[in-house]
Amino acid sequence: MTPGALLLLLLGVLGAHLAPGARGSEAEGRLREKLFSGYDSTVRPAREVGDRVWVSIGLTLAQLISLNEKDEEMSTKVYLDLEWTDYRLSWDPEEHEGIDSLRISAESVWLPDVVLLNNNDGNFDVALDINVVVSSDGSMRWQPPGIYRSSCSIQVTYFPFDWQNCTMVFSSYSYDSSEVSLQTGLSPEGQERQEVYIHEGTFIENGQWEIIHKPSRLIQPSVDPRGGGEGRREEVTFYLIIRRKPLFYLVNVIAPCILITLLAIFVFYLPPDAGEKMGLSIFALLTLTVFLLLLADKVPETSLSVPIIIKYLMFTMVLVTFSVILSVVVLNLHHRSPHTHQMPLWVRQIFIHKLPLYLGLKRPKPERDQMQEPPSIAPRDSPGSGWGRGTDEYFIRKPPNDFLFPKPNRFQPELSAPDLRRFIDGPNRAVGLPPELREVVSSISYIARQLQEQEDHDVLKEDWQFVAMVVDRLFLWTFIIFTSVGTLVIFLDATYHLPPADPFP
């Protein structure tokens, strides 16, 4: 190799050793060797045996994934923010070329075993063991991400107009309060933060829930929930007070239920002769049953309370059931006749004469009451008629038109027969009718009686049909009132169920 090539190679080696990056890596390597010489990651970083290690616990919420009401489980994506001081990992930056922080793997340093106590899946670990940031003064900061499934007791009384108070309880699993003391997280200004932190730029909104309050609190239970008798373990509890967005249930459940209830109400507006009263009522009842079965998979299986939407569905189902029963009553009244039922006087007084005035019903007058009386027949006195004196007396003594064919008396139709018999026999038995005329009059009176009976039968049947129509209209207004009042009472109660203005009143 020529002398020039050797000179270039020597200059390259010297430049590599004198480069700033190389010096920095060597300085950091030497610092690591110095810090971890004799370091034990299983030993608590306390200067004295009785000293406590202060651990600050913060929580950054990245996403409220879901709240499973049936399993009473809340899923969240969070970042833990743990800060403590390890005096063994401190140095003077001036002695190490200005290095003021290091990134060290989590397996190499002591970590406070802070876990989620109320987890619902048995997973106590974080999602990723990221590096710990170590500052020159010995302060440690670890921000591992995690997807937690925590238990959340669901209050279903006002579902779907409800709000829930879900908690995430963190504590050191191995150390009690005499060894590790917890406190809530610190803000960038160094002040204690009393709530869950949410970064507005990266937070993912939930389509079903909105966060109302997110406070945190340090709790010192008097009894160790894990059964340890050595000492109390402090807990930091993060609260998420969330309110449900009810639009989905309003559109897909409540609005169809109200429409089905309207169908059940208008069953009573449908004429009984239409033949679809029972079909429409049963259709509404079956539809509500399907809605009830669909909601059964949404709410927790608890006997502590009944959700308000289930109350409304049951209320509607009871009304629809009664509409089916009352439709049977209306159809029974509609198809009654004088041959099968006799109308009591109180039924006639209430449902024909009194109630229609208050229900806006007006029965049309019979046509016979609107017809004018036919003109009376003038007496005949024709000597050539050939009928004789008895015939003349018959026409002279002919009674008014409603005597031979009296106006119907639906209560006492039998009274017309004696009057007609007295007319045929005549007031004076000395005055008689010819046999031919008596036979004609007898036939006419028989036809008149048959027509009268048929007319009375039709009138009484129309009375039953009118009673059925009055009862139908009475049920219509009754159901409108009950449905309106019941719906307002049920849902107005939910409007007053609001999250508290102060999370800790």
From Swiss-Prot:
The name this protein goes by in its record: Acetylcholine receptor subunit beta
Signal peptide interval: 1-24
Transmembrane segments: 246-270, 278-295, 312-333, 474-492
Residue numbers of Phosphotyrosine PTMs: Y394
PROSITE patterns: NEUROTR_ION_CHANNEL
Glycosylation sites recorded in the entry for this protein: N165
Keyword Lipoprotein carried by entry: no
Stated role: After binding acetylcholine, the AChR responds by an extensive change in conformation that affects all subunits and leads to opening of an ion-conducting channel across the plasma membrane.
Subcellular location: Postsynaptic cell membrane; Cell membrane
Organism lineage string: Eukaryota, Metazoa, Chordata, Craniata, Vertebrata
Molecular function as annotated in GO: acetylcholine receptor activity; acetylcholine-gated monoatomic cation-selective channel activity; channel activity; excitatory extracellular ligand-gated monoatomic ion channel activity; transmitter-gated monoatomic ion channel activity involved in regulation of postsynaptic membrane potential
Self-association and partners: Pentamer of two alpha chains, and one each of the beta, delta, and gamma (in immature muscle) or epsilon (in mature muscle) chains. The muscle heteropentamer composed of alpha-1, beta-1, delta, epsilon subunits interacts with the alpha-conotoxin ImII.
Record has Disulfide bond as a keyword: yes
